[in-house]
């Protein structure tokens, strides 16, 4: 564990502190407070280094809770213009890759947030070379059984239809309907049934429970969660991440830094 930082180039630390002070000066932060923050907080220091082009990407977390890390990050790093910040997890099993969101940030997303998350997931899926097929998940499938808890998912579908997006989507549906081809006979009207590779969860708790159960009980390879929508190439490692998990996150952060124009 790193308890303190040793700055090998003190002038660079002054530059990063100056950058962060300019960002936070109208949010109640004095210059000496920001200088102390850069010296003592690895997230503030690392993200400011990336913003000042003194680093390309960053992986943080691992020894603190994910929520604590994301809250610190959101104070010093903005989201990408027009995007929400959320967690997306990749799961690879039987030669198929599935993207699941939001697994880590928003407890109970609104219909509009589900729409925004789905569009960001599609952007990421295309970066990874996938043809996105988006399923909005629920405990019901196309209105059966009826429940007020599924209405925000159904509303998200209607909102997305109005936007005339360039990807296939459908819902609401249960996960087995989204993933298993046997259900195509029951729902021949849907292009997504049995073909989904992007799963939009109705809430964070259902997403987190699902992917952690799969990670613990199956042979599926789980990568992430990846932090999507942040204005810099930064990933947060969950508590007690393994060496291979850290390497995966570092590779994805580096890839993001290379292919995404964060200055837009």
What is each model feature region?
Residues 1-264:
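Anion-binding alpha/beta catalytic cores of soluble intermediary-metabolism enzymes, centered on
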